[in-house]
């Protein structure tokens, strides 16, 4: 059993070594992050198990459904390339994944995504995220609030949301963000 993530694999040589060991059968099980799904060549994968896909599906992003489904399609493509393969998915959204994966309805998914995005999201409207970061949490929040007020007065820009970033503190700095939308890229 080997870990396959960015904490464990820091160089291209480490990556090649683990892939070679796995492809030779010296490693039976790889446990890792999304990094496992990214374009690496694995032989003889007969089982892929996906845990926590709902955290991607439930992200606060208009791209969440697309990211989750795309990741599962990538992972599914790893299993059974040379022979039989199986994919087990842990999810509370079985209907969504069954419909678009088992019934090969990816084209239908793309059409429904375009329809969903048509009124509010790219590629039909433009979006931007402004991130504020500073060691002084009060100062940076006040700065974000100041810009929110300015931006709300701009008739060409809609302030979709603002507040603490999902990862509120990083590298000893507090983080806030503003999400903006406009039909005019220059306004953003």
Protein language model features and the residues they cover:
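Short, conserved loop/turn and helix-capping segments at secondary-structure boundaries
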Residues: 62-69
């Amino acid at each position: 059993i080997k870990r396959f993530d960015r904490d464990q694999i820091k160089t291209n040589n480490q990556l090649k070594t683990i892939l070679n060991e796995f492809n030779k059968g010296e490693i039976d099980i790889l446990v890792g992050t999304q990094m496992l799904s990214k374009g690496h060549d694995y032989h003889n994968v007969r089982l892929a198990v996906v845990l926590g896909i709902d955290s991607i599906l439930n992200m606060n992003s208009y791209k969440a459904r697309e990211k989750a489904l795309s990741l599962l399609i990538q992972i599914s493509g790893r299993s059974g390339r040379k022979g039989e393969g199986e994919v087990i998915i842990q999810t509370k959204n079985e209907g969504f994944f069954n419909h678009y994966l088992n019934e090969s309805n990816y084209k239908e998914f793309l059409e429904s995504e375009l329809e969903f995005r048509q009124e509010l999201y790219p590629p039909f409207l433009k979006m931007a995220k402004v991130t504020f970061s500073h060691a002084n949490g009060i100062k940076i929040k006040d700065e974000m609030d100041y810009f929110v007020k300015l931006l709300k007065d701009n008739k060409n820009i809609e302030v979709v949301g603002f507040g603490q970033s999902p990862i509120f503190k990083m590298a000893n700095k507090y983080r806030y963000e503003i999400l903006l939308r406009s039909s005019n890229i220059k306004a953003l």
